[in-house]
Amino acid sequence: MLWDGTRFQRDRRLLLDDDGRIAAVGSVSELEGDPERMHGAMMPGLINGHSHAFQFALRGRAERFGLVQGSFWSWRDAMYDLVDSLDADRCHELSLASFNEMIDHGVTSVGEFHYVRHDDAQDHRLDDAVMVAAEDAGIRMVKLVTCYQTGDIGKPLEGAQARFDTVSVDEYLRRLDAIQSRLDGHLQTVGMVAHSVRAVSIEDIVRLHRVSVERGLPFHIHVEEVLEEIESCQAAHGCTPMRLLLDRGVVTPNVVAIHCTHSQPEDMRDYVAAGGQVCLCPITEGNLGDGIADIPVMRECGASLSVGTDLNSRTDLLEELRWLEYVQRVARQKRGVIVDADGDTGRELLRIGTEGGARALGLDAGRIEAGALADLVLFDHEHDSLAAADEDELAAALIFGASGSVISRVIVDGVDT
């Protein structure tokens, strides 16, 4: 069976070319040749829109709270302790573990939002460690090179934050060019990032965004994950972070806002109208106690959604998609919050995890059609957890009833990983 963007269909065939792309898709009778026969259901590889691979090391480390309940900020303290001890070898080890696990769960592409570096701005060892890890794992990576300059709006970096410092926009752009020149050009590309309005001045965000548009690169930014970010921005600028970006023209179709947990409906409507996308990380937002995003408003105004594993406490994107819907059901006491025009939630979630992720990372992937990247996943549709589902039910059964354990084969760029 083959996913066609709306359902799984039997007796379909696809041909791959020598450049890692899909050459043709059709029925068994339409395409000639003696193809390899594969038993199972094939779909586009899942696309992880937002990852901090090194945070894989925090599993279990930040889950003890004593007499005081934790928060995003107490978790951040644990993350800073990790940052202080991170060297290139450890960064490679953690990144490789994250990427290998993603591959096992059917993720073929990842947006790696990397912001840790050595004190010397010319030292690229940690960037290199992440890139080598992705190459070793065989995963497609968009290296989201991050600008990070302040500890909060108008405040200097402190402590472990010194390892995030990009010094200036000019230095950031030199770093971006240097990293781009070192990539595996076939499986790795770059995107641009301003960490957040807390970590980059609005003037520099405007400049970075302008360069991203000129170069045709994705532009990612954390937006309104926690209430304190909004309060800080309102105190400094008299408006929310999202409104600040809108007022300064930093919203175009290449912009992806990460989280939007506490975004105001009117801000979100204007943001989507300007072409902005949203990447949600429901497992991380649940782990950190951030809150629940207003997905109905996003859907109502036609937002392009994707998902990411963020802190990588879990790297199973099927579980991430399941959480995306289930958290909304719990919050609203209703079922079927995220559905397509036919009222099907499984199919819509699968599109978010594939087509939506491809849009967020600027990849020609996430679909099975001629010309698209041959990043594919085969899973066992006769697995005990899926055997009762027919073709029309299979997407929902996969999202809500299975895990990465049903994945039997992962193909990236036309090659088995």
Language model feature labels by segment:
Residues 61-140, 170-185:
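Alpha-helical scaffold segments that flank or form the walls of functional sites
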Residues 44-56, 218-227:
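Histidine-centered catalytic micro-motifs
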